[in-house]
C-alpha cells in the first residue's frame, strides 16, 4: 500500500468514526449513593411510603393487621358458607378457600374448580367477606378474577412468568407467595413482573422456606418479613399454616409474625380439621381460631397502650 492509499484509508476510517453512533454512557452515581436494586419498582428507593392494596374494600398495608381465614379447600357449599360465617364472627377480614389445588401428588384432592368459585362468591355475598383464592395458570385468570377479590399465586408458581404476565393485566390485586427455595431477591423480582406489567396492587406472602429441618413442613423466615419491609414498599403478610404444617404451631407463629410487623395473616380454618380433604393437620378449628383472634386483639391493644 503506497502513502496515498494509507492517507486515504486513515481519512475514511476517521470519517466513519465521526459518523457512527456511540453508545451513551450510563449515568454516574454520586459518590456514596446506593446502587439501584434490580427490583426497581418494588423498591423503597422508588417509593418511600408503604403501598396500601385495596382487596374488596379491605386495606392491606394501612397499619392494621388483616386476617384472611378459611379452609385449605372448598369442599361443599355448606362447608364454605358455615366456615365463612364463623370466621367472620371471630373477627376475620377476608375469606380464603382453594378452588384449584396444586397438590404434590396427582392422587390427592385437586379442588372443585369453577363450582367452588361460585360457592366462594355466594359466601362473600352472605357475609360481606372479600375472597382470596389461588389461580394456577393463565387460562384460569379471567374466571377466577370474576369471582375473587384477591388472586393468589402459590409458592410453586412464584416464577411462572406466563402466569405473572397475565395477572399483570387484570384489575384485581395479586397475593404473591414466596417460593419454597426462593431468595428474597428472586421473590421481589417475581413481584417486579407484576408491577412492570401494569398491576401496582401486589401483596407479598412469606409461607416458609425449605431447609434441612424436617420436624416442620417448612421453616418460617420471619427475618425475611422484617427485611422485605425495609427493602420494599409492598405490604407483606405471613401464612403460618403452610410455614409450620402443624396446627399447634400456628397460633404462636401467627403472634410472632404480628410482632415483627407483618401486614396480615393467612390462616387455614376448618370446622372439622380431622375430616378435611387437604391440609387438615395444619388447620385450626373454629374455637382455636377464635382464641387466636382474641390473643391478637389483646396484644395489639397492649402494644398501643
Q: Each predicted region: which residue ranges?
A:
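Glycine-rich, proline-tolerant flexible connector loops at the mouths of alpha/beta enzymes
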Residues: 96-114, 271-283
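Glycine-enriched alpha-helix->loop->beta-strand junction motifs that scaffold or abut catalytic
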Residues: 91, 143-152, 168-174, 195-201, ...
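N-terminal amphipathic alpha-helix/helix-capping segment at the start of soluble metabolic enzymes
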Residues: 6, 10, 33-68, 301-305
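Alpha-helix-loop-beta-strand connector modules within alpha/beta enzyme cores
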Residues: 109-133, 167-173, 222-236, 282-304
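Active-site mouth loops of central-metabolism enzymes
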Residues: 65-80, 106-110, 130-134, 155, ...
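Hydrophobic faces of well-ordered beta-strands that scaffold small-molecule active sites
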Residues: 66-71, 93-97, 131-133, 151-153, ...
Amino acid at each position: 500500500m503506497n502513502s496515498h492509499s494509507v492517507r486515504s484509508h486513515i481519512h475514511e476510517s476517521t470519517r466513519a468514526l465521526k459518523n457512527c453512533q456511540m453508545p451513551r454512557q450510563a449515568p454516574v452515581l454520586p459518590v456514596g449513593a446506593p446502587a439501584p436494586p434490580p427490583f426497581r419498582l418494588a423498591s423503597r428507593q422508588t417509593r418511600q411510603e408503604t403501598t396500601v392494596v385495596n382487596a374488596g374494600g379491605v386495606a392491606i398495608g394501612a397499619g392494621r393487621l388483616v386476617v384472611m381465614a378459611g379452609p385449605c379447600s372448598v369442599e361443599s357449599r355448606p362447608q364454605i358458607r358455615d366456615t365463612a360465617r364463623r370466621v367472620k364472627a371471630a373477627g376475620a377480614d377476608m375469606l380464603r378457600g382453594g378452588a384449584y389445588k396444586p397438590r404434590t401428588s396427582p392422587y390427592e384432592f385437586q379442588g372443585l374448580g369453577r363450582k367452588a368459585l361460585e360457592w366462594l362468591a355466594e359466601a362473600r355475598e352472605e357475609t360481606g367477606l372479600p375472597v382470596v383464592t389461588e389461580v394456577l395458570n393463565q387460562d384460569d385468570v379471567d374466571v377466577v378474577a370474576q369471582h375473587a377479590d384477591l388472586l393468589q399465586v402459590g409458592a410453586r408458581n412464584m416464577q411462572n412468568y406466563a402466569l405473572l404476565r397475565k395477572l399483570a393485566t387484570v384489575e384485581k390485586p395479586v397475593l404473591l407467595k414466596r417460593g419454597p427455595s426462593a431468595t428474597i431477591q428472586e421473590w421481589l423480582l417475581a413481584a417486579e413482573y407484576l408491577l412492570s406489567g401494569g398491576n401496582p396492587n401486589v401483596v407479598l406472602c412469606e409461607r416458609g422456606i425449605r431447609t434441612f429441618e424436617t420436624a416442620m413442613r417448612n421453616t418460617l423466615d420471619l427475618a425475611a418479613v422484617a427485611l422485605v419491609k425495609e427493602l420494599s414498599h409492598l405490604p407483606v403478610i405471613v401464612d403460618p399454616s403452610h410455614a409450620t404444617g402443624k396446627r399447634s404451631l400456628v397460633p404462636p407463629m401467627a403472634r410472632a409474625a404480628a410482632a415483627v410487623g407483618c401486614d396480615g395473616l393467612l390462616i387455614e380454618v376448618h370446622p372439622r380439621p380431622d375430616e378435611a380433604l387437604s391440609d387438615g393437620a395444619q388447620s385450626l378449628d373454629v374455637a382455636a381460631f377464635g382464641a387466636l383472634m382474641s390473643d391478637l386483639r389483646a396484644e395489639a391493644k397492649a402494644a398501643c397502650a
